[in-house]
Structure formats: structure tokens, C-alpha cells
Design a protein with these regions (language model features):
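Short "lid" loop at the C-terminus of a central beta-strand within the Rossmann-like core
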Residues: 55, 118-123, 160-161
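Short, hydrophobic/aromatic-rich segments at coil-to-beta transitions
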Residues: 1-2
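Flexible "cap/lid" loop of the alpha/beta hydrolase fold
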Residues: 101, 105-106, 110-145
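Active-site loop/oxyanion-hole signature of alpha/beta-hydrolase fold enzymes
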Residues: 49-91
Length: 180
């Protein structure tokens, strides 16, 4: 699997050769291309590109000052989109849905079709005056990305945050395996 450089940050991405149009798969927070493993047989034969975001497996770490700039993830996805010949189909989940929506706004001529599940607008908090929301989000990001959690602890915190405390531990083993 190849890598690209975006503003001095190394991004790993899954690339599967196949027929056009390309499917650009944008994963959720905390997940990488493995999130789509059950989807791949359904689109077998298509060209697939799926970036691993900053600080995710096989991608580099944040090198900037202060908090991680999520716009860098967008720039990586945009770079991959613009490398493709012709239009692409975008499939995005959660954070990946947010990135996909931004790509569609900024590059409508490159998008043939798009499908998003639970797109979250994390980036909107950068433009709000609500310090309480910024602080809560900052704590979540810090917990998820900068405390050096083991993968299992990260998944527990992430799933519990978006659901209820204990949600991760109450999942059936085969459901947890889908996240790993």
C-alpha cells in the first residue's frame, strides 16, 4: 500500500486496482481501511482508494504545533481525489462523511455519486463561539489521539463516548472484532 506526503505529513492509503470510476472510501474516526473489508466484495472489480488519516495505522503522526489540524486529513483525501482520472464515487462514514461532503462542495465536477452514513460535522466547532463545545471536543480528541491509548482502550473510549458507558464491553465478540 502506498503513501503520500501532505504538507510534510505522511499518509498511508489502501489502493486496489480495478475498473473506473474509482470508489474513494473515507472511514470513520479511529478506523482505517479495514472498516470497509465487508464492503470490498460488493464492489469487487472497481478501483478503490482509501486514506488512513493522520496518526492512524501506517500513517505518520502530527508534526505541527498545538492541536491536530483535521484539515490535514481533508487535504490528503483531496490530493487522492484530484489524482484520479475522471469522476469518482465517494463512500464515507462519520468523519469520512464530513470529509466527503467537503470534497463534494469544493470539487463537484469530480464527484459522480456519493453515499454517506452518519456524517458528522466535527469541523463546524472551529467556527463557533461556544467555548463549552470546543472544550468538550478538545477533551475527546485528546483522549482519542494524544494519550497513547492501546487500540482496545481507544475503541472502548470511542464507542462508549458515542453510545453509553459500557457499550464496548457489552458488545458481542464478533461485533468488537468488526471494529478491530
Amino acid at each position: 500500500m502506498p503513501n503520500i506526503d501532505v504538507n510534510g505529513h505522511n499518509f498511508h492509503y489502501l489502493e486496489i486496482e480495478g475498473e473506473q470510476p474509482t470508489v474513494l472510501m473515507l472511514c470513520s474516526t479511529g478506523l482505517d481501511s479495514r472498516q470497509w473489508r465487508d464492503m470490498l466484495p460488493l464492489i469487487e472489480g472497481r478501483r478503490i482508494v482509501c486514506p488512513h488519516y493522520l496518526c492512524y495505522p501506517k500513517s505518520g503522526n502530527w508534526k505541527g504545533e498545538g492541536d491536530i489540524d483535521s484539515w490535514t486529513d481533508y487535504l490528503a483525501a483531496e490530493s487522492l481525489l484530484l489524482r484520479e482520472d475522471g469522476q469518482v464515487d465517494i463512500l464515507g462514514h462519520s468523519y469520512g462523511g464530513f470529509i466527503g461532503l467537503m470534497l463534494a462542495v469544493n470539487h463537484p465536477e469530480k464527484i459522480r455519486r456519493m453515499a454517506f452514513h452518519e456524517p458528522t460535522v466535527w469541523g463546524c466547532l472551529q467556527h463557533t463561539d461556544r467555548e463549552d463545545l470546543k472544550n468538550e471536543f478538545g477533551e475527546v480528541v485528546e483522549t482519542f489521539f494524544t494519550e497513547g491509548l492501546e487500540p482496545e482502550d481507544f475503541l472502548r473510549d470511542f464507542v462508549d463516548y458515542w453510545n453509553v458507558p459500557g457499550a464496548w464491553d457489552s458488545m458481542l465478540d464478533n461485533r468488537r472484532d468488526m471494529w478491530r
